[in-house]
Regions:
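Alpha-helical segment of the N-proximal tetratricopeptide repeat
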Residues: 22-56, 60-63, 67, 97
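Canonical tetratricopeptide repeat
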Residues: 60-63, 67, 94, 128-131, ...
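Helix-start (N-cap) detector for alpha-helical repeat units in TPR-like alpha-solenoids
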Residues: 21-22, 55-56, 89-90, 123-124, ...
């Protein structure tokens, strides 16, 4: 009898020491913050063993897979999260990001549209959807999204730069030059912006002196694509 009581006590102790679903999830998040993504996935899998309906664990696992550039596996995990609960914008946004990395721009836009419908306050959705629309050459819609971002934060240099690319695609070199000036004012290390500014100044407006100055700046910043322009058009 005493032996049986002993084993019952041991089992009760082990059971009480078993981490809860929330504790496992929180540890997975901690490991994510420490960039230990594979270990984090193991903890999220343990959560899902306890509760296969935990949509947050599927979403978090997808993020960890995304960080490992395992985009197809991430998409699968985000999709499972959505199947369990489609009321949160997060898995739609995250799945859109994975599609964006795969250059599956149309699928990305569809997910960003859904995410935006669920929460229109998330500025990152507008920016990333703008990138996907840029990839689809839907320039006017991309400009709209980048403008939404810039309304909230005019100092977002990447939004300025990508807006400029959309404006060039939309045959608006005047607007593009303004956006590119804004870009290099905000980020003086953006060689690609100096390059695009210089090319646009020379090709659209015949501004050789200013264009060459910006092309040389791009080259000095390590943007090697500027070299052929400098060699061909900017030698005295």
């Amino acid at each position: 009898m005493k032996k049986n009581l002993f084993w019952i006590a041991i089992l009760a102790f082990v059971w009480s020491c078993s981490p809860s679903e929330q504790e496992l999830f929180d540890e997975g998040l901690r490991l994510m913050e420490a960039e230990e993504y594979q270990k984090a996935i193991e903890y999220f899998d343990r959560v899902l063993e306890k509760n296969p309906e935990n949509t947050s664990a599927y979403n978090a696992k997808g993020v960890a897979l995304f960080q490992q550039t395992k985009y197809d596996a991430a998409i699968s995990s985000f999709t499972k999260s959505i199947e369990k609960d489609s009321s949160s914008y997060k898995p739609f946004f995250n799945r859109g990001n994975a599609y964006l990395e795969k250059k599956a721009f149309r699928e990305a836009v569809l997910d960003y549209n859904t995410a935006n419908g669920l929460d229109q306050s998330q500025i990152d959705i507008y920016y990333n959807r703008g990138l996907a629309l840029l990839g689809l050459e839907q320039y006017e819609d991309a400009i709209f999204d980048f403008d939404v971002v810039l309304q909230g934060n005019p100092d977002n240099s990447l939004a300025q730069f990508n807006k400029a690319k959309a404006q060039l695609g939309n045959n608006d070199p005047v607007g593009a030059v303004e956006s590119l000036f804004n870009t290099v004012i905000l980020d003086k290390r953006n060689g690609a912006a100096y390059y695009l500014l210089g090319v646009t100044q020379m090709s659209a407006f015949g501004q050789k002196e200013d264009g060459c100055a910006n092309l040389k700046m791009a080259l000095n910043l390590g943007f090697r694509e500027a070299k052929s322009w400098v060699d061909d058009f900017c030698q005295e």
